[in-house]
Amino acid sequence: MSSKILVLPGDGIGVEVADQAIRVIDKLNDLGLDATYEKELVGGASYDANGEPLTPEVLEKAKQSDAILLGAVGGSKWDDVERSKRPEAGLLGLRKELELFANLRPALVFEALASASTLKDDV
């Protein structure tokens, strides 16, 4: 059964990151993965093309996908756009509608600051 992946490059470096992710998917498909992908607009790119940072059509495609790869959204180009139409609203809309509430990022604690950090070895 094929997996459906929605690729949302977004803005700035997100476009380059998404292009490389697609190369990985293509290579994995060559090695036996069964995945299809579709690229759509989100964030500032969607705002520029559609006047909305996340269109209902893209949201529906996201709901129908097995996975979503999102590059990055935002940039100074859209600083003066109404808050509800800013690129970040597209990301927030995806999180809300898909009930995604975690944003995991790698963290590094410098030894000299470990005692002041909220990151602990055990809880």
Predicted regions and their residues:
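Anion-binding alpha/beta catalytic cores of soluble intermediary-metabolism enzymes, centered on
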Residues: 1-12, 35-38, 44-123
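Glycine-rich phosphate/diphosphate-binding loop of Rossmann-like nucleotide-binding domains
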Residues: 6-30
